[in-house]
């Protein structure tokens, strides 16, 4: 269990198991993030501190290129909050991708803060708003740079005291206790109002895949291959040539692009190994954009291919 046991006697193994689960709740938070003790260590520590700060945490902004895992880290923050009693079991995680509203800024303002029936054409029913839906939980505004200044202004006014007005009801003031998390791929100082930025005390930059260590990149590759093996219900055997190509390739889309490359590679391998209990990944299974990438030494792809199981790969590299 890898926990400290303070009780000496248990009526059954089931009681011991339940005790261990209770004591260990939260002990593995963030630990399944590759880079937990490496490139992401300080970021994770700041995430924990941010969400734990009384009474309702401190707003946090994650900045970094697309595909670096910003959304995943925010989701882990919410898990951490639930597992450590910061959020109740009923607390909700509300994820809003602001880029979906880039061409309709009025709609996102209405959806965030709510509106009354008849407030505008098409408002056939009352809408409490996502800020109210997330009350007691977390509201994550992804691609926050897509918010128009008017919406940003209304947002930072809400952040001051937790009070706001619903569209179509200027007489009544509403309240919500919600933890706010933000993410952007842009330079926050260039796309966000200074008045909003001043209200976000925790601002962290997520490193691109190219800035992470070879070991972390290798572990990410193996993790994705393991996920695909579970998905297709077949053992995966991968050549050292393919592994080297995946490791040395440059990914503009970062972890997200690497995941897509591995899925396409496994798809090609599965198609070529239909009648086998396992799939064998060779260099021909790689997407052409990886095989013909100028950043990869061609000698890698013509080298002697040796197959490894995923366990062998983890032990070797």
Predicted regions and their residues:
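C-terminal helical "lid" of AAA+/P-loop NTPase domains
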Residues: 256-271
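Conserved AAA+/SF3 P-loop NTPase catalytic/coupling segment centered on the Walker-B
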Residues: 74, 102-113, 124-160, 189-199, ...
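Structural recognition of the conserved hydrophobic beta-strand(s) that form the central parallel beta-sheet
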Residues: 140-141, 178-185
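Conserved post-Walker A coupling segment in P-loop NTPases
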Residues: 49-121, 137, 145
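Interdomain "pre-motor" coupling segment immediately N-terminal to P-loop NTPase/helicase cores
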Residues: 1-22
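Conserved Walker
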Residues: 57, 84-88, 119-131, 144-145, ...
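Conserved C-terminal "switch" segment of AAA+ ATPases
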Residues: 191, 195, 210-244, 273-274
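Dynamic helix-loop-helix/coil hinge segments at AAA+ ATPase domain boundaries and subdomain interfaces
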Residues: 19-44, 106, 245-252
């Amino acid at each position: 269990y890898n926990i400290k046991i303070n009780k000496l006697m248990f009526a059954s193994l089931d009681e011991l198991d339940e005790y261990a689960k209770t004591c260990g709740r939260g002990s593995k938070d963030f630990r399944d993030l590759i880079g937990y003790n490496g490139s992401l260590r300080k970021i994770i520590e700041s995430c924990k501190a941010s969400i734990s700060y009384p009474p309702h945490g401190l707003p946090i902004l994650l900045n970094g290129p697309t595909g670096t895992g910003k959304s995943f880290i925010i989701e882990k923050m919410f898990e951490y909050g639930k597992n450590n009693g910061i959020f109740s079991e009923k607390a909700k995680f509300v994820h809003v991708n602001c880029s979906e509203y880039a061409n309709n800024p009025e709609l996102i303002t209405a959806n965030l803060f709510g509106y009354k029936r008849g407030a505008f054409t098409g408002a056939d029913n009352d809408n409490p708003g996502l800020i109210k839906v997330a009350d007691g939980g977390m509201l994550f505004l992804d691609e926050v740079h897509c918010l128009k200044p008017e919406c940003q202004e209304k947002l930072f006014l809400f952040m001051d005291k937790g009070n706001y007005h619903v569209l179509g009801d200027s007489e009544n003031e509403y309240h919500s206790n919600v933890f706010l998390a933000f993410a952007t791929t842009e330079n926050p100082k260039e796309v966000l109002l200074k008045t909003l930025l001043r209200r976000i005390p925790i601002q962290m930059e997520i490193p691109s895949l190219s800035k992470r260590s070879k070991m972390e990149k290798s572990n990410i590759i193996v993790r994705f291959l393991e996920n695909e093996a579970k998905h297709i219900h077949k053992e995966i055997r991968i050549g050292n040539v393919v592994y080297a190509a995946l490791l040395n390739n440059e990914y503009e889309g970062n972890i997200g692009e690497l995941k897509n490359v591995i899925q396409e590679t496994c798809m090609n391998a599965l198609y070529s190994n239909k009648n086998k209990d396992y799939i064998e990944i060779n260099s021909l299974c790689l997407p052409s954009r990886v095989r013909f990438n100028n950043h990869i030494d061609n000698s890698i792809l013509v080298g002697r291919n040796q197959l490894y199981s995923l366990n062998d790969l983890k032990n070797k590299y």
